[in-house]
Structures are given as C-alpha cells and as structure tokens.
Regions:
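An alpha-helical, amphipathic repeat domain used for nucleic-acid recognition
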Residues: 1-100
Length: 100
C-alpha cells in the first residue's frame, strides 16, 4: 500500500483524503495505510497541490476573485486535498500575484 500511496499523490495528483478513500474501497484497513499517509513529505505534497491550482487557475473562467477562489477550492477538494492545505496554497498564490 505504500507504493500505491506514492503513485496516487505523485502521478495521479490525489490528496490524502481521496487516497484513503480509495484504499478503504479496496478493503485495506485504515490502521495499515494511515502511517504511510502521515509519511508523505509535506513540502512535496504542497508543491503538487500548488502546481495543480496554478494550472487550474489558467483554465478557469470566473467573473471575480471570489468565484475563482471557490472554483479552485472545489476542484482541490474533489482531488482529495485537505481544506487547510488548499487555503494555504491559495493564500500563497494570491500573495505572489500581489507582488507582481
């Protein structure tokens, strides 16, 4: 299950929540895969999420910043990322936009 977790977040770009749900569907007990989810490198995980959000931001059409943020949050949640990580990446992205 460790390799499955790595593949899902590196290649399929899934978040921890969606990976956990997929493993539970395969009847793998949470006590087996939970330690591996906790071992995911936080920096790499946030980089993947940030890249996903930047790519999605380019393709999303929104009338204002509020609508854009909502669409990005819904997209990231559907990929299984946690709200705290999504908010962190969106805040960083907004700060970078303001610097330019």
């Amino acid at each position: 299950s460790e390799m499955c977790i790595r593949d899902r977040y590196r290649f399929a770009k899934w978040g921890k929540i969606k990976i956990g749900q997929a493993l539970q569907l395969k009847k793998i007990p949470q006590r087996v895969f939970s330690p591996y989810l906790n071992e995911i490198d936080e920096d790499e995980y946030l980089t993947i999420l940030n890249n996903l959000l930047m790519t999605k931001r380019k393709s999303v059409h929104a009338e204002n910043e509020f609508e854009l943020t909502n669409k990005l949050v819904r997209f990231a949640l559907s990929r299984g990322f946690e709200m705290k990580d999504i908010r962190h990446c969106i805040t960083l992205s907004d700060e970078n936009d303001n610097l330019e």
